[in-house]
């Protein structure tokens, strides 16, 4: 009986098409700014936004200029304010990571590369709106006026910590900014946000709730399990 030929094991290491310093090409992106229409955010139906969930909403052209119906038409002052918050967040993250690596903090998570997500969206909110963050959205507190010293006090867990050491580091809470406490279990922010949104609707309040999701949350039971109505 002939021996089975062993299958050769190979290792594939993916590499980025462009490295820092290279001129990137965005030719594979076929969408142009404005290819996906911008529906009325109040009156649109779910079917009108299906392509937006699976497609690419482009605001910037290849030269970095905003155009099309998704252009927010920000003023230079608004752009500078957003950039200032993002740079501050990057510097804050770098300093706190050094503290964690040298044993001065027990735990820390950066928002590296995601600074604009929370900061830009929080800038678009009204002051009465609620924020239900994850670990990656601490920059929203800068927009709402929280100072870095207060955030550092929380991460260290010292006597000036506004939650008195009852939370892990980077589990911020900021009552004045309607920034709800970060939860350790991922995915819980969705049910919290929905609950507050429903309460606001019952009371006819002019408020909205915003929350975020990442790969971890989208894979957890709280997010993927069907509701009793779906059973």
Model-derived segments and their meaning:
Residues 2-131:
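N-terminal amphipathic, basic-rich helices that act as targeting or association modules
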Residues 91-94, 98-225:
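Cofactor-binding active-site loop characterized by glycine-rich and histidine/acidic residues
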Residues 226-231:
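A short, hydrophobic C-terminal helix/tail in secreted or cell-surface proteins
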